[in-house]
Amino acid sequence: MSRIGKKPVQVPAGITASVDGQKVTAKGPKGELFFVANDEISVALEDNAIVVKPVNDSKDARSKWGMSRTMIENILKGVKDGYERKLEINGVGYRASLQGKNLQLALGFSHDVVYEPPQGITIAVPKPTEIVVSGINKQQVGQVAAEIREYRGPEPYKGKGVKYAEERIVRKEGKKK
């Protein structure tokens, strides 16, 4: 069984972290985030490190222990450095552009798809075939990237569609005569 929860989360320089009962708040150069731990998890700030422990030894408490520690680590990294996810668009005539803050996608449909990002998320289009989603909340950045990819996921025959930059498409062979 993983024991990732045993390791204390170090608070990086330039970030102020505070623990108020179950609520952990982090303030940094990129913004402010908070995480509310489950009642079965105790959170304490000791020697510039956040220590996470289960209240009792139940299986339910131990299962939430490692996740709570990782969530706290994610908010600390988010307010310090932020997160970004890169997407690539492949296909003839498939492209992306920005209209103000909204992302406009030409993906082979009769009309362009217009995506309005939620608050706290920044979308950049360095090239018409590249999209960069960035923000301080790791979950939200991944969710927005997944929603954009969902409009036209990569297909296995030609690889057309929207894919993550690090994603490898398993290609299929076409019909044989």
Curated annotation (Swiss-Prot):
PROSITE patterns: RIBOSOMAL_L6_1. This protein binds to the 23S rRNA, and is important in its secondary structure. It is located near the subunit interface in the base of the L7/L12 stalk, and near the tRNA binding site of the peptidyltransferase center. HAMAP family: Ribosomal_uL6_B. Keywords: Ribonucleoprotein, Ribosomal protein, RNA-binding, rRNA-binding. Transmembrane segments: none annotated. Pfam families: Ribosomal_L6. GO terms for biological process: cytoplasmic translation. InterPro entries: Ribosomal_uL6-like (IPR000702), Ribosomal_uL6-like_a/b-dom_sf (IPR036789), Ribosomal_uL6_a/b-dom (IPR020040), Ribosomal_uL6_bac-type (IPR019906), Ribosomal_uL6_CS (IPR002358). It comes from the Bacteria. GO terms for cellular component: cytosolic large ribosomal subunit. NCBIfam families: L6_bact. This is Large ribosomal subunit protein uL6. GO terms for molecular function: rRNA binding; structural constituent of ribosome. Part of the 50S ribosomal subunit. Belongs to the universal ribosomal protein uL6 family.
